Amino acid sequence: MAKAFLSLACALSLGACVMPPSASEKASDAARELNLSARFGNMDVAAKKASTNARADFVQRHALWGSRIRVVDVELAGMNMPDSDHAVFQVDYSWMRTDESTMRTTRVTQRWTSLGGAWAMESEERAAGDIGLFGEQVEVLRPVQRNAQFATKVIRED
């Protein structure tokens, strides 16, 4: 009886290992790999996940990451698959400029396509949040530097 139960348990557990990943799982893995690689500065790995048509634009838009822009966190916030070969991801970035301490957030929409089983990002655009993540020209207002000392008065009696 124990042998039969053990054999049945092994057969059922081995059957679960044979299931290939679904299209949504493959798309999620590709999007996660691109965004985490970009966050940690591995732009060569991240750029390989962009389609050949979008690669040059991707590299240009992320050129300031690691030098003037520090990406603090990235999160896949949502996913929509209109069909098995296309996916749309909502990605939330927390970031800051390296010369200031203000935390900013931006939501980005990424469009992905399956090319023969391999997923590639076709486009990305800012959907909401702070401007400047992709190197857009932003006028940064800085406070006027004031003299931190009090005015000095000299009192003399001659």
Model region roles, listed by residue range:
Residues T106, L115, A120-D158:
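Low-complexity, intrinsically disordered terminal/linker segments enriched in charged
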Residues V88-D92, R111, A120:
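Soluble periplasmic/extracytoplasmic beta-strand elements of cell-envelope proteins
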Residues E75-M79, R107-W112:
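Hydrophobic/aromatic beta-strand elements that line small-molecule binding cavities or substrate pockets
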Residues W95-R104:
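Short, cysteine-centered beta-strand-loop-beta hairpins and adjacent loop/turn segments enriched
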Residues S22-A23, S28-D29, L36-Q90, S101:
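Short solvent-exposed beta->alpha transition segments
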Residues M1-L6:
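Bacterial N-terminal signal peptides that target proteins for export
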